[in-house]
């Protein structure tokens, strides 16, 4: 069984409010990684992100900071063109205080460009999570395994796959794909079966080889998320 870090997702509006800081501090013992989502801003800039990071850095000794721009194609709010999205991700490397950066994977990506950006981020000591999200369904087992395989070829620190289950077999397939990957590949793996049906994938992540599990601070930011305080308590049972 692997050690699992708990990620708390936040989606602030305009700036980091003191009430949000208080909510984070109230759950500080449950948070290993704080995920700052930035796709909710219509035209987010690197300067805006840097300002938010500065506000959060006061607490940074307590957790790592992950920055994510989730595109609309993969279930987020972000409507940047692909080029604008990749330029933003690349520019995040220059912000001190960011520990981890999420970059999305799609079957039709420019492989060489993606690899250049990932290598660039790593040269600035950013851990990379390459991720893929399917909010409609769970592909068959062999396709799940293939997606994990394709993502790990970029040599990221983490590969993350989140899918929507429609029955218990979908959940089992995701867990099996994650378990097999963790036994055979070097990089860390994250597998999420979304919604209440797939909650076990969040709470028992480490049993199946997963390294990160995502929770919320108050209102869920994705289907099936629970508050990080409850999630931490569940994860430590295994």
From Swiss-Prot:
It catalyses: 3-dehydroquinate = 3-dehydroshikimate + H2O. Its EC number is 4.2.1.10. Keywords: Amino-acid biosynthesis, Aromatic amino acid biosynthesis, Lyase, Schiff base. The active site is at 133 (proton donor/acceptor), 160 (schiff-base intermediate with substrate). CDD domains: DHQase_I. One of its GO terms (biological process) is chorismate biosynthetic process. 3-dehydroquinate binds at residues 35-37, 70, 202, 225. It holds the Pfam family DHquinase_I. SUPFAM superfamilies: Aldolase. Pathway: Metabolic intermediate biosynthesis; chorismate biosynthesis; chorismate from D-erythrose 4-phosphate and phosphoenolpyruvate: step 3/7. One of its GO terms (molecular function) is 3-dehydroquinate dehydratase activity. Disulfide bonds: none annotated. It comes from the Bacteria. NCBIfam families: aroD. Involved in the third step of the chorismate pathway, which leads to the biosynthesis of aromatic amino acids. Catalyzes the cis-dehydration of 3-dehydroquinate (DHQ) and introduces the first double bond of the aromatic ring to yield 3-dehydroshikimate. Homodimer. Belongs to the type-I 3-dehydroquinase family. This is 3-dehydroquinate dehydratase. It comes from Staphylococcus aureus (strain MRSA252).
